[in-house]
Design a protein with these regions (language model features):
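Active-site neighborhood of HAD-like aspartate-dependent phosphohydrolases
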Residues: 2-57
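Short, acidic loop-to-helix structural element flanking the phosphoryl-transfer center
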Residues: 10, 72-101, 138
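Acidic, Mg2+-coordinating phosphoryl-transfer loop and its flanking beta/alpha structural elements
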Residues: 154-179
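Metal-dependent phosphoesterase signature
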Residues: 51-87
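Short glycine/proline-centered loop/turn elements that form peptide/ligand docking sites
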Residues: 22, 86-87, 137-141, 161-168
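Substrate-recognition "cap/lid" segment bordering the active-site pocket of phosphatases
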Residues: 102-156, 164
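Glycine-rich phosphate-binding loop signature in dinucleotide/nucleotide-binding domains
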Residues: 7-9, 95-97, 148-154
């Protein structure tokens, strides 16, 4: 990350992961468990033993109603921004490159807001579930490029997980920067 100008040579589009890339998520999982344990009734935990927890989560919209809002709040309360990545974003913006967020999770606008990042700086905000799958999905990565009208050979994916973000980039023939 130290030589960000060379990283952007020949690049016209930068596709960034959000969680763990734009902020340091160290300790977030533990804080999430502590914050959310109360929201899963014993009945739901019992259903886990019988394979019904996922059905309960979906039927009650727990993920959208409880999990994601809690995650957004905790990110705002204690996850520092990765200033080196934001410097790369600023340099890409200064150069007039296309910028996109391609996340494995929802609530993208809300997360950007609590991090003090303007969603308007990005040409596309999209999550893999909105595209019908999870990373690394070649079809999802291709759809991101299609929506941006971007060529793989001039696109740089930036992320914190090679097995997800890097695989997505390689699947479509794009460059990848692991932070």
């Amino acid at each position: 990350m130290s030589d960000k100008k060379n990283v952007l040579n020949g690049v016209q589009t930068v596709v960034l992961d959000l969680d763990g890339t734009l902020y340091d998520k160290t300790g977030l999982s533990r804080r999430m468990v502590r914050a959310l344990w109360w929201s899963l009734p014993l009945m739901a935990i019992d259903r886990l033993a019988h394979g019904g927890l996922w059905r309960w989560i979906v039927s009650t919209r727990w993920h959208q109603r409880v999990y994601l809002p809690t995650m957004v709040r905790l990110i705002g309360e204690g996850c520092p921004r990765r200033e080196n990545v934001l410097a790369l974003v600023a340099e890409a913006k200064r150069k007039g490159l296309q910028l996109a967020i391609y996340s494995d999770y929802g609530s993208i606008r809300e997360k950007l807001a609590v991090l003090g990042i303007d969603a308007k700086d990005f040409d596309l905000l999209i999550s893999a579930p909105e595209l019908g799958d999870l990373k690394p999905s070649k079809a999802c990565a291709e759809e991101v490029l299609r929506r941006l009208k971007a060529k793989p050979e001039t696109t740089l994916f930036v992320g914190d997980r090679d097995e997800k973000d890097g695989e997505s980039a390689r699947a479509v023939g794009a460059k990848f920067l692991l932070i």
